[in-house]
């Protein structure tokens, strides 16, 4: 089922039960595959994904780490979509996660965090999140683990 929500920019239909990020954006990993396929069929150029990421409400746990399994799952699903494209000979030549470190989001301030590295805005201390180590392994081994 759907429900209609009104916003200043447009009317948006939200499917009930669809997973969403902390920014309330839908999580739609198949969209990356279909976008790569469409753009390749239309323009016949290689694809570089320059920004793909998920906002989350992250915090430092009592063990001093930042555990973000939702972000790992998000990236894993989107990379699987790109792998599907590569398997179909769509020329995907790059993928950049947004963002390496938590930062100031123009519309949301410091509440929502996109980074693979947690930033304590008071002390400027950086703490690599679980997703940082997972993504480093993906890059090192050139495969989704």
Task: Give the predicted meaning of each segment.
Residues 57-67, 73-77, 84-85, 91-145:
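Aromatic-rich peripheral "rim/lid" segments of glycoside hydrolase catalytic domains that contact
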Residues 18-56:
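C-terminal substrate/ligand-recognition segments
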Residues 4, 52-53, 100:
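Short, well-ordered beta-to-alpha junction loops that form the rim of enzyme active sites
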Residues 17-29, 69, 120-126:
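A short acidic, glycine-rich active-site loop
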Residues 1-9, 13:
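Single conserved hydrophobic/aromatic residue that forms the stacking wall/gate
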Residues 29-33, 37, 41, 72, ...:
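Amphipathic, non-transmembrane alpha-helical secondary structure
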